[in-house]
Amino acid sequence: MEEDYQQPRFTIGRQSSMAPEKIPEPSVHSEEEVFEDGEEIDGGVRLMYLANEGDIEGIKELIDSGIDANYRDIDDRTALHVAACQGLKDVVELLLDRKAEVDPKDRWGSTPFADAIFYKNIDVIKILEIHGAKHPMAPMHVKTAREVPEYEINPSELDFTQSKEITKGTYCMAMWRGIQVAVKKLDDEVLSDDDQVRKFHDELALLQRLRHPNIVQFLGAVTQSNPMMIVTEYLPRGDLRELLKRKGQLKPATAVRYALDIARGMSYLHEIKGDPIIHRDLEPSNILRDDSGHLKVADFGVSKLVTVKEDKPFTCQDISCRYIAPEVFTSEEYDTKADVFSFALIVQEMIEGRMPFAEKEDSEASEAYAGKHRPLFKAPSKNYPHGLKTLIEECWHEKPAKRPTFREIIKRLESILHHMGHKRQWRMRPLTCFQNFEHKKKHNWDLSSHDGSSSGSHL
């Protein structure tokens, strides 16, 4: 009696992304080393081996000889699984051209697409997407309808047909229920990155809490399918960075009003009930303009709660180094006063019309702040309303404890704006009086002339 046929298991190279124990990549073997002399080699296993090795011609020959491109081993893995794990885009394209299924699931439920995402094989991800691969389950997926968050948006309601990129490429514009919205997507390649998913989750949790006229409004999110997305209001007038590039220096009154908008939004973040929020990436590109000409603070992707001490050295990958406080750059403990430092740089830039330390690279600017250097005040003194320059200097003080809070900053700015309005009225009054005097003088002269003419007529 013949023994039952045992389906072989392919264990060379990277294993399924969902396997409980992933076998490390071994060194490269020849086919002779893998298969013993005299051993009858299963054609499907040979196909998986050639897929692992990237042998295009060998794969073509095997499939042409009748080997099924969808052959599965005992773990239900296919040659496409193997090629996706290894990141071999040419093999992936060949197998798909030879009718390989795009979304076969192995015994653990992993697809070639999920494997490519796990091993961060970007080129393979793109190829599989083109061929209709379905996104794996979202990391924030829930099991029952009751658990679906109230803010959940059906992705089919988002229309990207006229989409355009906005705010540093992080957001894009879309249509949702007849209105324009800004959509932030979590890229496919970071779905397997627990740290990135955690940041996305933290930003989402944070946005739900925020309700203020000077904070960009959160509308909803897609968390039960991929790609996961955050949806916020869309502000078509762009960001402060675009405005400064286009106009350069702003009028002092405009700069102070904008500073008040930013300060009010930041004061709300710092004094919100529960845990205060440190923005940590306050810079012109993250400050948006609404239709009424007011500013709103946006992009909380790297925001932190309360006091923070980073457990790893700071890098400039996540945020703009040009506007960060020295204590953040040097990985010291920092709090809400780090945002006050960034605010000072932005206010000065609005008056000066140029970025702080514009002649330096971003990281060099941060090093300058850490070395107790500050941007020079080059604009004429008349461009700085009384008290504004002093306020800026206090806000970028080297000692965070010496910097004012945003509540204090608001009071100071309101006083500066009031003084500017009063001064403007004072300048206008003499002119008005002079105009009235000239009018009365002309009126009296006309009367005098009329009286003279009248007297003459009676002679």
From Swiss-Prot:
The enzyme's E.C. designation: 2.7.11.1
Biological processes annotated in GO: integrin-mediated signaling pathway; regulation of stomatal movement; response to blue light
Mutant phenotype after disruption: Impaired stomatal opening and plasma membrane-type ATPases (AHA1 and AHA2) phosphorylation in response to blue light in guard cells.
One GO term describing the cellular component: cytosol
Main location: cytoplasm
Keyword Kinase: yes
Stretches for region Disordered: 1-30
Enzymatic reactions: L-seryl-[protein] + ATP = O-phospho-L-seryl-[protein] + ADP + H(+); L-threonyl-[protein] + ATP = O-phospho-L-threonyl-[protein] + ADP + H(+)
The protein's enzyme class: transferase
Annotated GO MF terms: ATP binding; protein kinase activity; protein serine/threonine/tyrosine kinase activity
Catalytic center residues: 281 (proton acceptor)
Binding residue positions for ATP: 108-116, 184
UniProt keywords, alphabetically: ANK repeat, ATP-binding, Cytoplasm, Integrin, Kinase, Nucleotide-binding, Repeat, Transferase
Listed InterPro entries: Ankyrin_rpt, Ankyrin_rpt-contain_sf, Kinase-like_dom_sf, Prot_kinase_dom, Ser-Thr/Tyr_kinase_cat_dom, Ser/Thr_Kinases-Pseudokinases
Tissue specificity of this protein: Accumulates in leaves, stems, petioles and roots, especially in guard cells.
ANK-type repeats, residues: 42-71, 75-104, 108-137
Function description: Serine/threonine protein kinase that phosphorylates proteins on serine and threonine residues. Mediates blue light-dependent stomatal opening in guard cells by promoting plasma membrane-type ATPases (AHA1 and AHA2) phosphorylation.
Similarity remark: Belongs to the protein kinase superfamily. Ser/Thr protein kinase family.
Protein name according to UniProt: Serine/threonine-protein kinase 12
This protein's encoding gene: BHP
